[in-house]
Design a protein with these regions (language model features):
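A short hydrophobic beta-strand segment most commonly corresponding to one strand
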Residues: 46-47, 93, 108-124
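A short, N-terminal "cap"/entry segment at the start of jelly-roll beta-barrel domains
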Residues: 1-42, 56, 127-144
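Asparagine-centered strand-capping/turn motif at beta-strand->loop junctions
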Residues: 103-106
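Short, conserved beta-strand element in jelly-roll/cupin
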Residues: 47-50, 59-76, 115-118
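Short acidic-glycine-tyrosine-enriched beta hairpin
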Residues: 80-96
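A short beta-loop-beta micro-motif enriched in histidine and acidic residues
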Residues: 34-43, 51-66, 80
């Protein structure tokens, strides 16, 4: 039997995350995973998206994604679709395999709880950047 754990969010180390398909950076606190806490079937991060942040169009083939804003507003864009503002009081559910882009078009940081379900480790989520005819992902609001 696993033991009960009480985690202080401020005690969890922050990781500044950048990559070729991200405009700006995000700040992650890895909170739940099989390796960290013994939880199976869910990966949970607290993520801060600074103003101007964009994680360009991509998908996760092996995990459903859930985003719960704690502060600020994030903008979600699917393919096809129109931008949707997601703010505190909302729960955004993105089923596995769905193309999506998330950005902070506001003037203050957006902080979210970010879950992947059906997996116990980040490496199991799967990741594919959006490519069409050799082009990079479309910009937010790019009409796809």
């Amino acid at each position: 039997m696993s033991e009960v754990k009480l985690l202080g969010i401020e005690e969890i180390e922050q990781e500044v995350f950048t990559r070729w398909d991200i405009t700006g950076h995000q700040v992650n606190r890895h909170m739940l995973s099989k390796a960290l806490t013994g939880t199976e079937g869910v990966v949970l991060d607290q993520i801060t998206f600074p103003p101007g942040f964009v994680h360009h169009m991509h998908r996760h083939p092996h995990a459903d994604m859930v985003v719960i804003p704690l502060s600020g507003v994030v903008q979600f864009l699917g393919v096809p679709g129109s931008p949707i503002e997601v703010s505190p009081g909302h729960v955004l559910v993105i089923p596995r395999g769905n193309w999506h882009e998330i950005s902070n078009v506001g003037t203050v940081d957006s902080e979210v709880l970010h879950f992947f379900t059906g997996v116990g480790a980040v490496d199991d989520i799967g990741y594919e950047a959006y490519q069409q005819q050799g082009q990079a992902a479309p910009p937010l609001g790019g009409g796809r």
